[in-house]
Structure formats: C-alpha cells, structure tokens
Curated annotation (Swiss-Prot):
GO terms for biological process: gluconeogenesis; glyceraldehyde-3-phosphate biosynthetic process; glycerol catabolic process; glycolytic process. GO terms for molecular function: triose-phosphate isomerase activity. Keywords: Cytoplasm, Gluconeogenesis, Glycolysis, Isomerase. Pathway: Carbohydrate biosynthesis; gluconeogenesis; Carbohydrate degradation; glycolysis; D-glyceraldehyde 3-phosphate from glycerone phosphate: step 1/1. Homodimer. It comes from the Bacteria. It is found in: Cytoplasm. The gene is tpiA. The keyword Mitochondrion does not apply. It comes from Streptomyces coelicolor (strain ATCC BAA-471 / A3(2) / M145). This is Triosephosphate isomerase.
Length: 258
C-alpha cells in the first residue's frame, strides 16, 4: 500500500494580520527546528493579505513549512471585484488552496459546481486543492452523512483527470463539529474517510485512492489528534482555531510523540 505522508494544515481563517503572521510562522519554525519533522508535512493557510509576508519569510529562511490560500477564484482575471486568481497565488508560490470550505458554502452559497470550477482553476495554475466536504447536523442525525459527503466529493472532482485527482487532498469536516467544541468521534470520522477512499476507487482506481491524503477537520486539538490519526484512512488534519496557538499546533503536528 502507498505510504501517505500526513498533512497537518492550519486554517487561520480571518485571523492574524501580516505582522502577526510573520511572528506566528517564526514561532512554528523555531519550535519544529529541534527535530526532523519530514515525517509530517506542515502547512498554513493564511489570509490573502498575509501571503506575501509568509512567502518572504519561508523563502528567506528556507523554512520547510508550506503555505497556501483559503480560497481561489474560478476565473483567471478580469472584472471580478474582490476575487483572487490562481495566477496571483501561483506567483506567490503557494502550494495549497482550500476549496469548498463549509464557511464558503454557507456564507457565499458555493455549490458543488462552483467548487468544481475552483478545483480545476487550482490545478490549471499548479496549486494543490484541499477539497473540503462534510455534512450539517441534520444530515448526520438523519443518517445520510456518508451519502451527502460522497456526493460533494463526486461533485468537486467532476471531469477531473486521474493525473490531477491523485494529488488532491480531501478534508472531511463535519460542519457541526467546526468551531463548536463538538468532536466527531474517531470511529465516525474513519467511517466517512474510508467511504471517501472507496468513492475515489470507484471514480478512478484503487491505486489512485491509496495515494490520496484524506484529512479530518473539526475541533482538532492536541488532546484528540493521536486517536484520530491512528485510524487507517485519516492522513492528517485541517486545524482551525487550534492552529492560531503555535504551541498547540506544534503538539498537533507531533501527534506521534503523545
């Protein structure tokens, strides 16, 4: 079976200005520098206004931390006020971009069709999309959470070639567990992540499915990350609030030490 390097990505959301971002990344880099952490890939998803500062710091100090954006326009440029394009993010040397986060779906009415267009825009410009999927509480309580999430996966990857799909990162984030303190149990998270891998095998091949990293997101903390990461189909975490505390995020990155 393919060995998948865990990806721990901190989604800062609308937090940290560019000066705070520099200090935060410096703290992370310093805390991780005393031990080789190649076994875990670390990334931060910063607000657009922070990206140039993060790029300068990462390039200048040759840091191993990857970085990316929290959204991308489906368009390459033009009269789209407030949008940020793939070419702009590529010029900033972003590695990742989150696509279809539940907050984008909820507050900006992003449909699977829009998310799919953004996934394609990311690949067009050499960015790796972190495709976010997951159900609301009513869907979970009705027992339709797997079906709902797999429909989002299929919609997000529609018409995507295998050579692109094999590098996608999929983040399963049950909406009811994001920022609420409620945590989806490790077994429940594994159920959905295993189903996502099964859907990838159905859409493409088992070989491709075994390559794709599937993250869990939703109130991930140092106290629960080891149990979550012990599951066979969970390959990392998309960390929200806890990623704003550098000490806490380092503990999450080093889940194997717990």
């Amino acid at each position: 079976m393919t060995t998948r390097t865990p990806l721990m990505a901190g989604n800062w959301k609308m937090n940290l200005n560019h000066l705070e971002a520099i200090a935060h990344v410096q703290k992370l880099a310093f805390a991780l520098a005393d031990k080789d952490y190649d076994a875990v890939e670390v990334a931060v998803l910063a607000p657009f206004t922070d990206l140039r500062s993060v790029q300068t710091l990462v390039d200048g100090d040759k840091l191993k931390i990857k970085y990316g954006a929290q959204d991308i326009s489906a368009h390459d440029g033009g009269a789209y006020t407030g949008e940020i394009s793939g070419p702009m993010l590529a010029k900033l040397k972003c590695t990742y971009v989150a696509v279809g986060h539940s907050e984008r779906r909820q507050y900006h009415a992003e449909t699977d069709e829009i998310v799919n267009a953004k996934v394609k825009a990311a690949y067009k410009h050499g960015l790796t999309p972190i495709l976010c999927v997951g159900e609301e509480l009513d869907v979970r309580e009705a027992g339709n959470h797997v079906e709902h999430t797999l429909a989002q996966v299929e919609g997000g990857l529609k018409d995507l070639a295998a050579e692109q799909a094999e590098s996608v990162v999929i983040a399963y984030e049950p909406v009811w567990a994001i920022g609420t303190g409620k945590v989806c149990g490790a077994d429940d998270a594994q159920e959905v992540c295993a189903a996502i891998r099964g859907k990838l095998a159905e859409l493409y091949s088992q070989e491709l499915a075994d390559k794709v990293r599937i993250q869990y997101g939703g109130s991930v903390k140092s106290g629960n990350v080891a149990e979550i990461m012990a599951k066979p189909d969970i390959d990392g975490a998309l960390v929200g609030g806890a990623s704003l505390d550098s000490d806490e995020f380092v503990k999450i990155v080093r889940f194997r030490d717990q």
